[in-house]
Amino acid sequence: APQVVTLGCRLNTLESEIMRSRATKAGLNDTIIINTCAVTAEAERQARQTIRRLHRDNPAKRIIVTGCAAQLRPEKFAAMDEVDRVVGNSEKMDDGLLEGPGCEAVAVSDIMESPRNFNVPMISGFAERTRAFVQVQQGCDHRCTFCIIPFARGPNRSVHPSHIIEQVQTLTAN
């Protein structure tokens, strides 16, 4: 099965589970997806360290880097010899994440151009957790001087309430 390494917040945990499900269905057993965090410089340092370690331990596997650190500094991760592909936060929920080695090495768009309404792909459960997470919104419209999140996640966008209810019902049934 594909390996997904999650660094950072609960939203990354949810998104990692979605990517794990899609990568498994696509048969990407030779791939490691690293979902990064950028809330501190230390988080980015740990992401680079994790990438190097995973490549050293699994030299034959493709490494895809995504998440907030990848969104904010795609060129930094693309310059790492260990990295095969860098995917932005808008793109990581697309099936395009799963494209093979012939796809573009960096797929990161302007997060501020994200649509105001969106739905998160449904999942039936969390493979390695006893708690589930349900996304109700993403992004932030505030521009606090100390916070990088609006630039990594984009403007505030809400998930439609009916989608939230359906996701909760699916998770509780499983």
Q: For each predicted feature, which ranges?
A:
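Proteins enriched for Cys/Gly/acidic motifs involved in redox and nucleic-acid/cofactor modification
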Residues: 1-174
